[in-house]
Each structure stands twice: as structure tokens, then as C-alpha cells.
Amino acid sequence: MSAGPQCGFSLPFLSHAVHREAAMPNALATEIANAAARFVVEEGLEWGPAKRRAVRQLGLPARSPLPDNDLVEDAVREYIGLFCADTQPAELRALRELALVWMERMAEFRPHLGGAVWYGTATRLSDIYLQLFCDDCKSAEIALIDHHVDYEPRTVTGFHGESVEALSVAGRSAALGETIGVHLLVYDLDDLRGALRPDARGRVPRGDARAVRRLLDEEPSA
């Protein structure tokens, strides 16, 4: 913290100033976030790898504190606004339409859309993340097998930081003319209760098919 001239301020004012400064992102965190945002938008990296790569690119120590996701999200939105404003809205719409296709296919498992496609920061390089809430955690996998859908099982980090089984499939977007990764994260039905708690910014962190349709209705068509 910089030692600015603070003589004559009362103790309550000093305390308020310290808290205000601590809450503000420092210049280094902002620099890392801005570098990470470019990797997220231009290369489709997830935020964690993008932050670590930004640290390396900037020549910082590997253990440098990383910016929080809110700061990275702000940087991503700013980058999109500056460099992708003409293309990103149509790409986002195409991804949400593809997400809805898979949500309808997997409707019995209460699918919810999360991540960049839900929050509106996705581009054509972004994958789609759907959370399924199942009575039987194997039932979603069985459904894919029954419908002859090729998938790749993997383990990912869930929204509580725990390990979660994911079924990754390839979804074809006619609007984008590309194949998009669609990741089906399998949760217990009981997890649905806490899945809709507001995030740090007071937003609902994921939405069901009805919510996705509402987003599409609110967007201008490409």
C-alpha cells in the first residue's frame, strides 16, 4: 500500500480508506487480467489456464497472485467490446441455440446452462457447459449410449470445487459452420438446490431451457 500523506485524518476515515484501497484491483492484477482476456477471446482458453499463461507471458513469478474471475470477466467484456463487437453477438447466439438443442435432448436430466455461453462472454472458440441433475448419475451416460452418441468421459472441477464426472460430446453448429465441444457435467439431483444461488455479483449463475429461450428472445437475430 502506498504511504500517501494521511496526517490529520481521523481513525475512522483511515480505516475506510484502507478498506476501499484493498477492495480495488491493483495494477498488476489488472495487467494479468487483460493479458488473460486476450487468450480467452482469441484462443478459447478457460480462465484458469489463461491466467497462468498471462503470468508466464508477462515474465512474472509462477506463484504470483492471480486476479479473481470477476476482474477477468470485466477484461474479457472490454476486449470483446473493442475487438469483436461486430462478430461476437452472432457467435454467442449460435452457441446458445446449440446449447438449447442439447438441453432439449437431455431434458429429462434437468439441464442448466452455465459458463461463458450463459453469461454472454462466449465466442465461436468457446465450449458449451451444461450441468445435468440426475436421480442416477449413470443415467445420462446410458442415454447417450442408447442414442448412439459418441462421447468422452472425463473429470472436471464442479461449481463447488469438487471433482465432477463430465461427458464431452461434439455438437455441430450450422450457423457457425463448426463443431463445438459440449460438456455435460453430471450432478446428483440434490445439488440442484444450491445450484441457483446468486454469484458474487448477485447474478443467477446458470439457467434452464426456459431461461435460455428467454435470452434468445431478448437478443436481436443475426
Residue spans for each PLM region:
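Acidic, Ala/Val/Gly-enriched low-complexity intrinsically disordered segments
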Residues: A3, A17-V18
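Leucine-biased recognition of intrinsically disordered, low-complexity hydrophobic segments
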Residues: L11-L14
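A ubiquitous short alpha-helical element
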Residues: V18-M24
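Charged, low-complexity surface segments at secondary-structure and domain boundaries
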Residues: E21, C84-Q88, Y129
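Catalytic core of pol beta-like nucleotidyltransferases
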Residues: N26-G44, P49-R124, D135-A222
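Short hydrophobic/aromatic beta-strand micro-patches
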Residues: Y129-D135
